[in-house]
């Protein structure tokens, strides 16, 4: 079987919903990343077999194809857009790696993009052309049958209740995320991931959701979103805009083209869970991944689990017995933000830049009761 390696990875800084990036459509968010790869790796770009991108709330069509054309890549390069909800970016990376393993191609660009600010509104189609009632807007997408389709906040509350994750534990984890993120921004670790871009004449190179300092006591001052609950705005992620691209190729070709370090894709798993508990998906996904590769949690140096809500990450940490020295060691989405279809690719990008780590897992909890996870080693 061929081996797939990730040899380059970059992302935009993530903008807040309605923030600096609010005027940019998904293909415009991707354009500077494509152009960066085109300028830095011209010989490789000419060999691309496909572009695979995750996207969740875009305006339809095939964003991967449209974006590569907008960026001036060759007409002969195809593109495919994947929607596995919040797991889309990680799914796209796995898809590209699997295609290489199968011998279907040798060079891929994978990643994800999201503009929550530009997400279109959707209305229900009338049953008859003669209806006079005002159009009814969809509040959100439906992930499962009505009786098992909680909002993401309710899903986080369900996980917190089922797994005994207290408000205090959730706030403590959120504080940790902000502290670790701030520390790794300051020491330059996170800046390695980011390609600075110019927006309306201004340089944009820092995640817009970041808070320079939040006193620990502040987390306890927020009221629960749902009365009687434990999930608050402070222990939940923000909605964000941003894009991520990774260059993935067959290992022998990577060496031939002068690449000598990066991530080696070992395996990936996607599972289903109770759709009322969407955030718990990483538990069986990671468990299955470890079992299939005859590993234990102790064999993994770093585990990145997307921080949609403190409740679900803490529940996963406890269920899998992950230590604090393994979990989200540079912080996470509670501080940096969550651009849905790009977040899984961002986790892999983060692992790419942890040059001193040898064994790593990225995992996402996904709306509708899903979880995915991917295993990487250094090459």
Curated annotation (Swiss-Prot):
Q: Which GO terms describe its biological process?
A: fatty acid beta-oxidation; phenylacetate catabolic process
GO cellular component terms given for this protein: cytoplasm
Query: What is a GO molecular function of this protein?
Result: acetyl-CoA C-acyltransferase activity
Enumerate the SUPFAM superfamilies for this protein: Thiolase-like
UniProt-listed Pfam families: Thiolase_C, Thiolase_N
Query: Which InterPro entries did the record assign?
Result: Thiolase (IPR002155), Thiolase-like (IPR016039), Thiolase-like_sf_Thiolase (IPR050215), Thiolase_C (IPR020617), Thiolase_CS (IPR020613), Thiolase_N (IPR020616)
Top-rank lineage group of the source organism: Bacteria
Q: Enumerate the UniProt keywords alphabetically.
A: Acyltransferase, Transferase
Q: Which residues form the active site?
A: 86, 338
> What CDD domains does the database record attribute to this sequence?
thiolase
Stated family: Belongs to the thiolase-like superfamily. Thiolase family.
Query: Which PANTHER family does the record cross-reference, listed alphabetically?
Result: 3-KETOACYL-COA THIOLASE, PEROXISOMAL, ACETYL-COA C-ACETYLTRANSFERASE YHFS-RELATED
Recorded protein name is: Putative acetyl-CoA C-acetyltransferase VraB
Protein species of origin:
Staphylococcus aureus (strain MRSA252)
Q: What is the lineage of its organism?
A: Bacteria, Bacillati, Bacillota, Bacilli, Bacillales
Q: Which gene encodes it?
A: vraB
